[in-house]
């Protein structure tokens, strides 16, 4: 989870199996990133501006509604643990409505659902105020490929673009 403090990005994590140390090592040289290790999901999610979760197996919601501050954005790579957000978040963004149509609370959040591509193309507004809680069910059907390809192309057009070969595997687990 991430929240801002001035120009600093504060990254809150729960430590599991030493993964948190590898993540901190990746960013140790960046003076604008600070890490906070937490013991509970309430500590991690409470007060965070951005919540990203890639957990694949959970049987209940991580936290109760009051831990999601106004203005936060939640991006669950796997949607488990965040079903309560379906019921009270102000906006839901998705890249493919058909993939979420079968969700338990789809009928509740369908009226506030916006396609991510529509936002990127300017056909629909993104965040319209600083208090909206936004849930992003983005499975990356093709939009990620297009963004990465555009960035790679732009960098390839720049002479002497530095490239550092990855020699280690990094698996980042926030929860």
Regions found by a protein language model. Give the residues of each.
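Adenosine-phosphate binding glycine-rich loop
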Residues: 85-175
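Short, glycine/serine-rich, charged loops/turns that create anion-binding
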Residues: 18, 81, 140
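Conserved beta-strand segments of alpha/beta enzyme cores
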Residues: 10, 34-36, 134
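A general structural motif
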Residues: 8-10, 71, 89, 132
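NAD(P)-binding Rossmann-fold cofactor-contacting core
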Residues: 3-29
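Rossmann-like adenosine-cofactor binding region
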Residues: 32-107
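Charge-rich, low-complexity terminal tails
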Residues: 21-56, 155-175
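Short, well-ordered alpha-helices that flank and scaffold nucleotide-derived cofactor binding pockets
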Residues: 1-4, 154
